[in-house]
Amino acid sequence: MQLTYDEDQIAFRDEVRAFMADKAQLALGEDARHGMHLTKDEVIAWHKALAERGWIAPKWPVEHGGAGWDPIQVHIFDEEAFAAGMPRLPNFGLNYVGPVVIHFGDDWQKERFLGPIL
């Protein structure tokens, strides 16, 4: 499938691409860039860089610590991360537990569980 991006999406893609190029300086070993297992320190460094940028939870609403991206932005990020050889985001907490707590949890549960997932 070939997508045609509008100007804002192209600007976002360029921003993500620049971020990936900058973060290629992280201590991600050659094995990690080729899909091999990451060390704990590599995972922490990558997640820290994403968290500092506000990109650790692309699909989450901003009010809960996420980036609040739409599906096209998520696709652009995933595509650029893959092209740059960067590791995938962790799935379970960000994609399953967090969204359930955001949707069904009360304020206490959101306060208690969402921060640690990030």
Q: What positions do the PLM features span?
A:
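Intrinsic disorder at enzyme termini
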Residues: 1-13
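Residue-level signal for inorganic ion chemistry
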Residues: 9, 20, 106
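Glycine-rich flavin
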Residues: 25-118
